[in-house]
């Protein structure tokens, strides 16, 4: 914003203050207090440069860091470090407990900034147990399948197959069997009668020969 516009606004404010004072809206003390708070003329070169607390950035140490050389800042877990400069993604410069130095960026996390997320370069991640499990091979999968317990009897997985009922022979075939058995019995009876007749005939012939010899 240009300096002329700012100075014009200051002039308008003083004019309004004079009007309020003349109208008995504000007292002389209030008028003097406000008028003294305003600069006579605004100069960009003389503008105050006060750093607000919100612009300060702090980090919290996660791990202990022992200085390796001059200029390093030793850290202990829980130390609050005022961040002065980010030299690189790997190294920060900060101040803690009256000491200023350089420390690893992945040894700290943001603090007092409303964010609890990790730093830009977190330590190596911890692998989950699920990721460490080996993928089973085909042989191991087959072995595990064979070692599975048998299912309970209620599942009827191993039930014996039901015996199919034997079908009765057709009526025609059964009738033929009955006829064959009946004819076989008739032949047997007829043969028995023939045998008896032959025996009777032979006996009668012998008897007649004996009678003829007597007479």
UniProtKB/Swiss-Prot annotation:
Subunit organization: Interacts with LAS17, RSP5 and SUP35.
Q: Does the keyword Phosphoprotein apply?
A: yes
Source species, please? Saccharomyces cerevisiae (strain ATCC 204508 / S288c) (Baker's yeast)
Recorded family membership = Belongs to the LSB1 family.
What range does the record give for the signal peptide?
Answer: none
Motif position, PY motif = 124-127
* Any GO BP: negative regulation of Arp2/3 complex-mediated actin nucleation
Query: Which conditions up-regulate this protein?
Result: By heat shock. Can thereby reach physiological protein levels high enough to promote prion-formation.
Q: Which residues carry this modification: N-acetylserine?
A: 2
Q: What does this protein do?
A: Overproduction promotes the de novo induction of the [PSI+] prion form of SUP35. The prion-inducing effect depends on the association with the actin cytoskeleton. Also implicated in prion maintenance during heat stress.
Give residues for the crosslink Glycyl lysine isopeptide (Lys-Gly) (interchain with G-Cter in ubiquitin): 80
Known InterPro entries for this protein?
SH3-like_dom_sf, SH3_domain, STAM
In terms of SMART domains, this protein maps to: SH3 (SM00326)
Which residues are annotated as modified residue Phosphoserine in the UniProt record? 52, 55
Q: Which UniProt keywords apply?
A: Acetylation, Cytoplasm, Cytoskeleton, Isopeptide bond, Nucleus, Phosphoprotein, SH3 domain, Ubl conjugation
Q: Which Pfam families would you find in this protein's record?
A: SH3_1
Instruction: Consult the record and explain the modifications the protein receives after translation.
Output: Ubiquitinated by RSP5. Ubiquitination reduces the protein abundance and its prion-inducing ability.
Question: Region entry Disordered: which residue ranges?
Answer: 114-189
Report the superkingdom from the record: Eukaryota
User: What are the record's GO terms for cellular component?
Assistant: actin cortical patch; cytoplasm; nucleus
Keyword Ubl conjugation in the entry? The reply is yes
Name the gene behind this protein. Answer: PIN3
Where does this protein reside within or beyond the cell?
Cytoplasm; Nucleus; Cytoplasm, Cytoskeleton, Actin patch
Name of the protein described by the UniProt record: [PSI+] inducibility protein 3
Further comment found in the protein's record: Present with 2190 molecules/cell in log phase SD medium. Although this protein promotes prion formation and it has a Asn/Gln-rich prion-like domain, it does not seem to have a prion form by itself.
């Amino acid at each position: 914003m240009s300096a002329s516009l700012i100075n014009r606004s200051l002039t308008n404010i003083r004019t309004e203050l004079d009007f309020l004072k003349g109208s008995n809206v504000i007292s002389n003390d209030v008028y003097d207090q406000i008028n003294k708070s305003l600069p006579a003329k605004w100069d960009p070169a003389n503008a105050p440069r006060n750093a607000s607390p919100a612009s300060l950035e702090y980090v919290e140490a996660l791990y202990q860091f022992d200085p390796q050389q001059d200029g390093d800042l030793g850290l202990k877990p829980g130390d609050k470090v005022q961040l002065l400069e980010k030299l690189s993604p790997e190294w920060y410069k900060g101040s803690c407990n009256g000491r200023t130095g350089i420390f690893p960026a992945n040894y700290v996390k943001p603090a007092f900034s409303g964010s609890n997320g990790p730093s830009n370069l977190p330590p190596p991640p911890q692998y989950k147990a699920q990721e460490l499990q080996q993928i089973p091979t085909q042989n191991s999968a087959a072995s595990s399948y064979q070692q599975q317990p048998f299912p309970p009897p209620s599942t009827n997985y191993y039930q014996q197959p039901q015996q199919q009922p034997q079908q009765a022979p057709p009526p025609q075939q059964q009738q033929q069997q009955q006829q064959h058995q009946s004819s076989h019995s008739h032949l047997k009876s007829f043969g028995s009668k023939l045998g008896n007749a032959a025996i009777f005939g032979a006996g009668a012939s012998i008897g007649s020969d004996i009678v003829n010899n007597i007479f």
